[in-house]
Amino acid sequence: MRLLDDLRAGLDAIDAAHLRRVRRTAYSPTDRSQRIDVPGGEPREILGFCGNDYLGLAAHPALMQAVGEGARRYGFGSGASHLVSGHSVAHARLEARMAALQAPHIPDADALCFCTGYMANMAVVSAMAQAGGIQPAQDCTVFSDALNHASLIDGARLSRAAVKVYPHVDLAALEAQLAACGSRNKLIVTDGVFSMDGDIAPLPELLALAERFDAWLIVDDAHGLGVLGADGVGVLSHFGLRSERLIYIGTFGKAAGGAGACVVAHRMAVDWLVQRARTYIFTTATPPAVACGVEAALDLIAGEEGAARRARLAGHIARWSDHAQRLAARFGWQWMPSPTAIQPLVIGENAPALALAAALEREGIRVAAIRPPTVPAGTARLRITLSAAHTEDDIERLARALEAAGQSQQSAARAA
């Protein structure tokens, strides 16, 4: 069939460019190591440096207990969307908790839960582009960092607003774009922590531009909530920001160890999202038990255990940074210094990055090789992520294995 032939040709092109994505099946809970399927063999235990469970909470007994108790109390499914009959007291409690956490940074804060971070980001950008009832967003411009997450990019596309992409964290370029913009409604959109580079957005400077040019500042804090700021409150706390024009998106599938997301903003902006956010209105609400689990995670994050886990993670980051700097200098890779759990090593081309990841897996270590279109062409990388669940020995084992893989690759290149 011609349609299948077209698909086959497209898949062949993906293979030729070393860009095929594959799924791996895990047979055990998310932790520092997991039993993972091995092509052509039996599943085996592999030490992971590729997940987003930054505090090691995904399999925490307190979270599992909270989810179980929530299911016994509220059942499994929500049964409907939030605006029909699916909004549980468990959702309401979680929203109140998130609003309280961000209240020092967003005056008159309210919150709204979403099923995923992707849905939250798409909703906020597309709905806020229509603020004031402009449909489509004919008098709105979205200003988006070049390295923003795909969900923010898709939200801008869905909004049908004008979109201006500014070079990564280039404040001068953004200022020039804002100065030249005649739109009544302006949205500055950014990751808080950039997911592939690990750097933190210059939010104080971005907020100053938002104030100067009367724009909203939308911050996706997927990788900051639980890790950055006082008591893990996130990137707004990290910088000590406060403004009515801030819209904060925190996701629960990373440091919080669960699933879902929450938007925190001025109560009027949240009410607007209830009226206009399509990914909130037209989908079944997250199971209430999940909200119970996330609330338990927030308890841990705010307490002594959360502080201890953040301190352990910070120690791992410092230890790994020393190794990464040394290895990058030796093998000609690009080390991207990051104060976060995301620790990229840019290799360059796709094939060498894949080969290094494969060599690590042969040693029982799993690291993701990230390639275009997720990252720009020529910047394929090993996206190494650290967790409080790791041990110091785990960090040393990764360093030894990567050094051996780099040496082998370097020797092969010299012999060719």
Swiss-Prot record:
**E.C. designation(s):** 2.3.1.47
Gene Ontology MF terms: 8-amino-7-oxononanoate synthase activity; pyridoxal phosphate binding
Origin species, per record, is: Ralstonia nicotianae (strain ATCC BAA-1114 / GMI1000)
Single GO biological process annotation from the record? biotin biosynthetic process
Oligomeric form and interacting partners: Homodimer.
Report the cofactors. Answer: pyridoxal 5'-phosphate
| Record's keyword terms, sorted | Biotin biosynthesis, Pyridoxal phosphate, Transferase
Q: Please give the pathway this protein is involved in.
A: Cofactor biosynthesis; biotin biosynthesis
* SUPFAM superfamilies in UniProt: PLP-dependent transferases (SSF53383)
Per UniProt, substrate binds at: 21, 149, 374
This one is known as 8-amino-7-oxononanoate synthase
Catalyzed reactions: 6-carboxyhexanoyl-[ACP] + L-alanine + H(+) = (8S)-8-amino-7-oxononanoate + holo-[ACP] + CO2
Q: Does the keyword Signal apply?
A: no
Residues annotated to bind pyridoxal 5'-phosphate: 117-118, 195, 223, 251
N6-(pyridoxal phosphate)lysine-modified residues are: 254
Which gene is the coding source of this polypeptide chain? bioF
Which protein family is it in?
A: Belongs to the class-II pyridoxal-phosphate-dependent aminotransferase family. BioF subfamily.
> One Pfam annotation, family name?
Aminotran_1_2
Function of this protein?
Catalyzes the decarboxylative condensation of pimeloyl-[acyl-carrier protein] and L-alanine to produce 8-amino-7-oxononanoate (AON), [acyl-carrier protein], and carbon dioxide.
**Lineage top rank: taxon:** Bacteria
